[in-house]
Amino acid sequence: MERSFLVFHVGTYTLGVPAEELIEVNRNLSCTKVPGSPKMIRGILNLRGLLMPAIDMAAYLNIPHSACESFSIILKVQENNIALMVDSIGDIMALNEQELVLPPTHLSGQFQETIQGAFKLSSGLLILVDTAAISRNAQHHHGHSQDQIPSLPILSE
């Protein structure tokens, strides 16, 4: 069965989220910092009266050399709105869900629940992230320090 995904980039990684959850994409939205919030939460974004956490995807996935300041992907995940802060936006791609390669079983912590798998593309891998897991982790952060979170693993092609 084909399903559409919004493709985006964080550092050197190509990631995707289900297009049906997409509300809009914006450039350079500012958010209000919240004292004491974890590093992955950039702050609270007010988009036309809708308040939502602004999640720094580079910090969330521990991807170095990425500022995630260029684009905000606004999503409706179940009953919650979230904003993913990313480096750049790609296309919306229709992919066959049967071609999804499951992630390695040795992933742990938030990566085990966040990475749903990957699609093989001609240009490399598209890593599919679970937006429901990101939303849960953003709203019920377990207090992980940056040092306790492993970096995003390299999936072999």
Question: What are the residue ranges of the model-derived segments?
Answer:
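An acidic, low-aromatic, low-complexity terminal/linker signal
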Residues: M1-E157
